[in-house]
């Protein structure tokens, strides 16, 4: 199963990259977790933030591999516990599906981007920094894998 995290932002603190990679490296090859980054548009005083959000959303969609199903992360999406996430991942794995998890920038994702999603997932009702969401997603995928395989990480 190929899992792509497609996210806005390339210039992030080293601990974000290290946190994501730490969980990605723990997963076996049949749970291939990759990060695809797109550059964030410049946000200056007076910038049209809606236009930036639309442009970034389109770049995210364009970066999704053709065979991959789109899952978007949005605070208004469905909140699930980790065992439910594990069930979803197990089902997609059984169906031999590749998925791409889209994480928008500070302004979020466009309605067009959300409409293309197979599922809209909320990590929390809280608003999280988009960079931190990458690490949380990677950890939750690793934890879900540990449930699927009865690995002791999830107790």
Curated annotation (Swiss-Prot):
The keyword Cytoplasm applies. It catalyses: pseudouridine(1915) in 23S rRNA + S-adenosyl-L-methionine = N(3)-methylpseudouridine(1915) in 23S rRNA + S-adenosyl-L-homocysteine + H(+). Pfam families: SPOUT_MTase. It is an enzyme of class 2 (transferase). Its main location: cytoplasm. GO terms for cellular component: cytoplasm. It is found in: Cytoplasm. Specifically methylates the pseudouridine at position 1915 (m3Psi1915) in 23S rRNA. Belongs to the RNA methyltransferase RlmH family. Homodimer. This is Ribosomal RNA large subunit methyltransferase H. The gene is rlmH.
């Amino acid at each position: 199963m190929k899992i792509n995290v497609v996210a806005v932002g390339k210039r992030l603190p080293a601990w974000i990259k290290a946190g994501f990679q730490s969980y990605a490296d723990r997963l076996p090859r049949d749970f291939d977790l990759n990060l695809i980054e797109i550059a964030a548009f410049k946000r200056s005083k007076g910038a049209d933030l809606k236009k930036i959000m639309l442009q970034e959303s389109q770049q995210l969609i364009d970066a999704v591999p053709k065979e991959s199903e789109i899952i978007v992360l949005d605070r208004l999406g469905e909140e699930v516990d980790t065992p439910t996430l594990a069930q979803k991942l197990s089902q997609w794995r059984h169906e031999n599906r590749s998925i791409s998890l889209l994480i928008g920038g500070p302004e979020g994702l466009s309605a067009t981007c959300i409409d293309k999603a197979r599922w809209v997932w909320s990590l929390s009702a809280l608003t999280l920094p988009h960079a931190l969401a990458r690490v949380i997603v990677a950890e939750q995928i690793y934890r879900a894998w540990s449930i699927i395989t009865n690995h002791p990480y999830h107790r």
